[in-house]
C-alpha cells in the first residue's frame, strides 16, 4: 500500500503564486477599488484587510464568437419542433441585448456584475502606499532612518513555486538519492560479481544462482523505489527586507482644533494624518513624529491626545508655527535632520494673524524644512490664510498646498502630496 505524506508547511498557500500574478495583472483596478474603499472605513480601522471588487468586464478573457443578426443555418439538438431548412422568425430587437425581453423597462442604464475577493492587511497597505516617498530626502552624516529594500538571501526550504531554484533542488535530489542508495548499490555490485562467478563455475549451481538473481531483483526494486525528487529536496530563492541606512527625519503634524472645525472636518483631518502615520511607519523604520494641536494656543501632545482630545477654542494659526520653530531649534538641527511638516486646517484664521503666518513660514520654517504641505478642508470660499499661502507656493519649491472638500478627496490629495519624485539623490 502506498502512503502519501504532505510535508508542505505552507500547503494552504499553494495558490499564492497565482494570487500574486492576479494582483499584478489587475493592479490598476484594485488600486481604484482601494481608493474608493478607504473612504468607507472607520478612522481607527487600520488593522484589517479589505474586500476588493472588480467589474467582471475588466477580468473577462477576450474571445471570438458569432455576431448577432445575419442568416445562419443551425440545428439545435433535442428539439421536437424544427428540422433542417425550417425558417424561424427573427426575435424582436434584432441584435440587441441578451435579455429575454419580457421584463419591465428601466431608466437606470447599464448594470455590471462585480468580482469580489479579500486582500490581506499587508497587501492592502502595500497597494495603498505604492510609489510614495518623503520628498527631497537628503542623506546626512548621522544616519538613523532605515528604508527597507528586498535582497536575495540564499535559499530556503519553504516558498512559492515561482521562487523555486531548479538547479539547487536537483543537486539536493542527487545528494539524497546517492546517500540513500550507496549501501544498496555496493551490495548490488557484490551480488552481481558473485552471480557472474557462479555462472562461470563448474558444475552449475542452479539453486544458488536463482537465490542471487532473486536478491539482485529485490535490491534493484528497493533502489528504484527511492523517489527521484522529494519535498525535502526543494529549495526556493529566499528574499528578505533589509534596512538600508538613510537620513534621519522628523515629521511635524499641525492640526487646527478651533471651534470653526466641526466634527466632520476634524474627522477628515484625522483620516489624513492616520494615512500619513501609516505611510511613515510602514515605509521607514525610524522617523520622529511631533504632534501639535492648536486653537488660540498651540501645544505639543502625544499621539493619543492628538487624535482623541476634545479641547477647542478660537483660531490663531501662528501659535502652531511658533511652537514648531521652537521645537526645531531645541531638538532638531536642520544640518542633521530632514524636517517635514503637514498642516491641516479649515482656513478660518484671525485676519491679522495670516500675514504673520506668511512671515514665519517664509523667514524661519521653509528655509530649514525639506517639504511643507498645507491641506485646507472646507467647502467655503478660501480666506486670507489660503491667499497668503498662495504667495509662498509661488516662491518656495518645497511648499505644497491642496484643497479637500469631501472625504473622497483625502486619498487622492495624499498621493498628490507624497508621490515619489524622480530627482537626483543628494549625498
UniProtKB/Swiss-Prot annotation:
It comes from the Bacteria. Transmembrane segments: none annotated. Residues 72-109 are annotated as: Disordered. Residues 77-90 have a biased composition (Basic and acidic residues). InterPro entries: UPF0229 (IPR006698). Residues 92-102 have a biased composition (Gly residues). Belongs to the UPF0229 family. This is UPF0229 protein KPN78578_11640.
Amino acid at each position: 500500500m502506498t502512503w502519501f505524506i504532505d510535508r508542505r508547511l505552507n500547503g494552504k498557500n499553494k495558490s499564492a503564486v497565482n494570487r500574486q500574478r492576479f494582483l499584478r495583472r489587475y493592479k490598476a483596478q484594485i488600486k481604484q477599488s482601494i481608493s474608493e474603499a478607504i473612504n468607507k472605513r472607520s478612522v481607527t480601522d487600520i488593522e484589517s484587510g479589505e474586500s476588493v471588487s472588480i467589474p467582471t468586464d475588466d477580468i473577462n478573457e477576450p474571445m471570438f464568437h458569432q455576431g448577432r443578426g445575419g442568416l445562419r443555418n443551425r440545428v439545435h439538438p433535442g428539439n421536437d419542433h424544427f428540422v433542417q431548412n425550417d425558417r424561424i422568425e427573427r426575435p424582436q430587437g434584432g441584435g440587441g441585448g441578451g435579455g429575454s425581453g419580457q421584463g419591465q423597462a428601466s431608466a437606470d442604464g447599464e448594470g455590471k456584475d462585480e468580482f469580489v475577493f479579500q486582500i490581506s492587511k499587508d497587501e492592502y497597505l502595500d497597494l495603498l502606499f505604492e510609489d510614495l516617498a518623503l520628498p527631497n530626502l537628503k542623506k546626512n552624516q548621522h544616519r538613523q532612518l532605515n528604508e527597507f529594500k528586498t535582497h536575495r538571501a540564499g535559499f530556503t526550504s519553504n516558498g512559492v513555486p515561482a521562487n523555486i531554484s531548479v538547479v539547487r533542488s536537483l543537486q539536493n535530489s542527487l545528494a539524497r538519492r546517492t546517500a540513500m542508495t550507496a549501501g544498496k548499490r555496493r551490495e548490488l555490485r557484490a551480488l552481481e560479481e558473485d552471480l557472474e562467478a557462479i555462472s562461470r563455475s563448474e558444475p552449475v549451481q542452479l539453486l544458488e544462482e536463482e537465490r542471487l538473481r532473486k536478491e539482485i531483483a529485490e535490491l534493484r526494486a528497493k533502489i528504484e523505489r527511492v523517489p527521484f525528487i522529494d519535498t525535502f529536496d526543494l529549495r526556493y530563492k529566499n528574499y528578505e527586507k533589509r534596512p538600508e541606512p538613510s537620513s534621519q527625519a522628523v515629521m511635524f503634524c499641525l492640526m487646527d482644533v478651533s471651534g470653526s472645525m466641526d466634527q466632520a472636518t476634524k474627522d477628515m483631518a484625522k483620516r489624513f494624518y492616520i494615512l500619513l502615520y501609516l505611510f511613515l511607519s510602514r515605509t521607514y523604520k525610524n522617523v520622529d513624529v511631533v504632534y501639535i494641536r492648536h486653537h488660540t494656543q498651540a501645544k505639543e501632545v502625544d499621539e493619543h491626545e492628538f487624535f482623541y482630545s476634545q479641547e477647542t477654542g478660537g483660531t490663531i494659526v501662528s501659535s502652531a508655527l511658533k511652537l514648531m520653530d521652537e521645537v526645531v531649534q531645541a531638538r532638531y538641527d536642520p544640518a542633521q535632520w530632514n524636517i517635514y511638516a503637514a498642516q491641516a486646517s479649515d482656513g478660518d484664521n484671525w485676519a491679522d494673524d495670516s500675514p504673520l503666518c506668511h512671515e514665519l513660514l517664509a523667514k524661519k520654517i521653509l528655509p530649514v524644512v525639506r517639504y511643507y504641505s498645507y491641506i485646507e478642508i472646507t467647502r467655503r470660499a478660501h480666506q486670507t490664510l489660503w491667499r497668503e499661502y498662495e504667495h509662498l507656493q509661488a516662491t518656495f519649491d518645497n511648499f505644497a498646498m491642496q484643497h479637500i472638500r469631501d472625504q473622497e478627496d483625502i486619498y487622492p490629495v495624499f498621493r498628490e502630496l507624497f508621490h515619489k519624485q524622480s530627482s537626483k539623490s543628494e549625498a
